[in-house]
């Protein structure tokens, strides 16, 4: 680059300019400046652009590789989760089936227990009925006995006068004393 600058400066000097000065022709000065800029760009641009593009290419390659790695991990995790989901569904189906079986067993046990309870209640009712009948019969016997005693007492009062009662008492005392 410096070589190019020296060459351009030498050519300007040989052209009679006598050195570096102010060139009032802006078009010519701009072309000269543009030529210098293009020279610098052509000399340094391939290295700098190559490095920038290489860095950019590497970043893109790294990003692609990272994305592919994440995609593989995601696919692996998805497969594992789908497997877990299938296992969970199978477990849920098994639990539902067991619950159905348990419900059926419980239903049968409840039906059996209900039948046994019903039989016990019927037997208890029959026993209660028998006990009630016995109680009623005993009550009737007691009432009949009371009525019979009352009737006998009434008959004795009517038949026994005071003399007869005295004789009966004396005879009873004599029987007790004569023993």
Curated annotation (Swiss-Prot):
UniProt keyword Membrane, yes or no: yes
**Which cysteines link up through disulfide bonds?**
none
Q: Which GO terms describe its cellular component?
A: plasma membrane; plasma membrane-derived thylakoid membrane; proton-transporting ATP synthase complex
Residue ranges spanning the membrane: these are: 26-46
HAMAP family in the record, alphabetically? ATP_synth_b_bprime
Matching InterPro entries: ATP_synth_B-like_membr_sf, ATP_synth_b/b'su_bac/chlpt, ATP_synth_F0_bsu_bac
Quaternary context: F-type ATPases have 2 components, F(1) - the catalytic core - and F(0) - the membrane proton channel. F(1) has five subunits: alpha(3), beta(3), gamma(1), delta(1), epsilon(1). F(0) has four main subunits: a(1), b(1), b'(1) and c(10-14). The alpha and beta chains form an alternating ring which encloses part of the gamma chain. F(1) is attached to F(0) by a central stalk formed by the gamma and epsilon chains, while a peripheral stalk is formed by the delta, b and b' chains.
The record's family statement is:
Belongs to the ATPase B chain family.
Q: What does this protein do?
A: F(1)F(0) ATP synthase produces ATP from ADP in the presence of a proton or sodium gradient. F-type ATPases consist of two structural domains, F(1) containing the extramembraneous catalytic core and F(0) containing the membrane proton channel, linked together by a central stalk and a peripheral stalk. During catalysis, ATP synthesis in the catalytic domain of F(1) is coupled via a rotary mechanism of the central stalk subunits to proton translocation.
Q: What is this protein called?
A: ATP synthase subunit b
Which is one GO molecular function term here? Answer: proton-transporting ATP synthase activity, rotational mechanism
Q: How does it sit in the membrane?
A: Single-pass membrane protein
Q: Does the keyword tRNA-binding apply?
A: no
Subcellular localization(s) per the UniProt record: Cellular thylakoid membrane
Primary gene name:
atpF
Give UniProt keywords alphabetically.
Answer: ATP synthesis, CF(0), Hydrogen ion transport, Ion transport, Membrane, Thylakoid, Transmembrane, Transmembrane helix, Transport
């Amino acid at each position: 680059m410096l070589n190019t600058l020296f060459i351009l400066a030498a050519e300007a000097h040989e052209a009679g300019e006598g050195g570096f000065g102010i060139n009032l022709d802006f078009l010519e000065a701009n072309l000269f400046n543009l030529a210098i800029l293009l020279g610098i760009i052509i000399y340094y641009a391939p290295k700098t652009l190559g490095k920038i593009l290489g860095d950019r290419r590497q970043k893109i390659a790294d990003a692609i590789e990272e994305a592919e790695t994440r995609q593989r991990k995601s696919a692996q995790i998805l497969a594992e989760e789908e497997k877990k989901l299938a296992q969970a569904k199978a477990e849920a189906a098994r639990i539902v089936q067991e619950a159905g079986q348990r419900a059926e067993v419980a239903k049968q046990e409840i039906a059996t227990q209900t039948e046994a309870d019903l039989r016990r209640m019927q037997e208890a009712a029959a026993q209660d009925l028998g006990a009630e009948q016995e109680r009623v019969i005993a009550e009737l016997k007691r009432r009949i006995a009371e009525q019979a005693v009352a009737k006998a007492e009434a008959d004795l009062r009517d038949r026994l006068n005071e003399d007869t009662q005295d004789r009966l008492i004396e005879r009873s005392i004599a029987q007790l004393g004569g023993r």
